[in-house]
């Protein structure tokens, strides 16, 4: 079943002026109005049964594993039709709007292992990639882009404040304009332990980053030889209720 989306980003004059000043092809495409004809979407999810193990008079859950994957493809049907072409940027259009063409795959693996009644270890790995091609020669649309940082990702950075690649600078005060990408790799390892009946402590390590699929002015393209040294690492301690 095809899903049709019209991405209409309402940009303030100041925001548009900043885009014009940056003159970045990648960002201009990511924040442009686009017609998205989603050719197909597929999802897969697996979760094992959590078995209980006894320790004296009490019982606790053993290892729990979950995996889910999501695949999206867009623009291929419209590209096959190739209606009208915008002579200014060379893109084909539908309803006078350039349409996006890409494939995107996102994977998430989670392992939770109870060590004893008062402690557990948690591991998470995520990897995703989107490939813009055909009618989209620069980047994924904003709605399908990846970002890094935040409480559910790399906790050493604010949400959308990490990357892409070795890029170190924020060109906007809100730190959201430039920190998007087409590829994401990340993992976290966390040890949780009881500090009482309602309070738990957590020691964690997070690693990961985002990259662009194509080369851009920020030198943020994903390259195997640079991947390890461009990984961002954070470690810390937290409290959970």
Model-derived regions: residue spans:
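Hydrophobic alpha-helical transmembrane segments and adjacent short intramembrane/lumenal linkers
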Residues: 182, 197-199, 229
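C-terminal outer-membrane beta-barrel translocator/porin domains of Gram-negative envelope proteins
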Residues: 1-193, 204, 211-213, 220
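In a subset of proteins, long, contiguous C-terminal domains/tails are tracked
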Residues: 66, 93, 111, 200, ...
